[in-house]
């Protein structure tokens, strides 16, 4: 445990320097990207912490696959750590400024990933991977079942695809911070003003179109189609996410004040740990591991 913590401290220090270089460049040359950078930097930090135990079990030089690299902050960081990483990008709509920021990231990175410029559901590779992952990507993929199949095809035996994304059984849409009403279509009719009037996105209509309304039952069906995969949901992730709302200012800033206040009260009373006992189907997020037999 001490060795893992010590290594994570070194990784965080390296990542701090990398993010500081990009932040300085953005402030000087592309200030219009600062808000996007802050969001993506917070997500990359969270993702690296989330993956720490998975990555600690892998040897240096292990072949990694990031499904949806976004602005490539995490992929570049992992490449700098010595991993042989491939990032699938692009996928989905509604990400106009991502390419601009991604180009800056690649320009300033100490090491770069191999980039597969295709949708996840079109990915083909002769390479076999030790580990695959994605954070808040599966909800934007046009054909998530096909994406799972393509990833399964390139995993080594014993390797996992670990992903985190919303669960739309729960009546909340996190990108727009709105309640949902049974279906995407009905939600759009009821919440159209909030969706189209969102000023925190470059292209809110495009982001909305990209959402596929993925759910835990759908993921179970995807996995059931592939006899070589075993499926596991990590329910305790919800506890960590609740705690994140109090420690990550950028993350909390994208949530309603009443929601953050309620979470703060729950954490103070320590009752937020009960969230880990909620069935995966009823949780607002899903932390999924698909392991290749």
From Swiss-Prot:
InterPro entries: SAM-dependent_MTases_sf. GO terms for molecular function: methyltransferase activity. SUPFAM superfamilies: S-adenosyl-L-methionine-dependent methyltransferases (SSF53335). It holds the Pfam family Methyltransf_23. This is Uncharacterized protein Rv1509. It comes from Mycobacterium tuberculosis (strain ATCC 25618 / H37Rv).
């Amino acid at each position: 445990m001490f060795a893992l913590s010590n290594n994570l401290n070194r990784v965080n220090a390296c990542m701090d320097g990398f993010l500081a270089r990009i932040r300085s460049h953005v402030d000087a040359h592309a200030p219009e990207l600062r808000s996007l950078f802050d969001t993506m930097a917070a997500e990359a930090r969270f993702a690296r912490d989330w993956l720490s135990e998975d990555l600690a079990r892998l040897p240096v030089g292990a072949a990694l696959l990031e499904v949806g690299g976004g602005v490539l902050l995490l992929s570049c960081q992992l490449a700098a750590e010595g991993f042989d990483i491939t990032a699938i990008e692009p996928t989905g709509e509604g990400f106009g400024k991502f390419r601009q920021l991604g180009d800056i990231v690649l320009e300033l990175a100490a090491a770069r990933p191999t980039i597969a410029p295709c949708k996840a559901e079109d990915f083909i590779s002769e390479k076999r991977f030790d580990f695959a992952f994605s954070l808040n990507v599966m909800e934007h993929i046009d054909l998530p079942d096909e994406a799972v199949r393509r990833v399964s095809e390139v995993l080594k035996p014993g390797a996992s695809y670990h992903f985190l994304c919303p669960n739309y059984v729960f009546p909340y849409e996190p990108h727009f911070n709105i309640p949902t009403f049974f279906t995407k279509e009905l939600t759009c009719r009821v919440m159209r003003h909030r969706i189209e009037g969102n000023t925190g996105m470059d292209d809110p209509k495009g982001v909305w179109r990209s959402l596929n309304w993925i759910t835990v039952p759908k993921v179970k069906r995807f996995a059931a189609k592939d006899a070589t995969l075993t499926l596991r949901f990590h329910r305790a992730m919800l506890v960590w996410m609740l705690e994140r709302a109090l420690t990550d200012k950028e993350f909390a800033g994208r949530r309603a004040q009443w929601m953050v206040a309620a979470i703060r009260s729950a954490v103070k009373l320590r009752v937020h740990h009960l969230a880990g006992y909620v069935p995966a189907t009823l949780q607002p997020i899903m932390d999924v591991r698909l392991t290749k037999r």
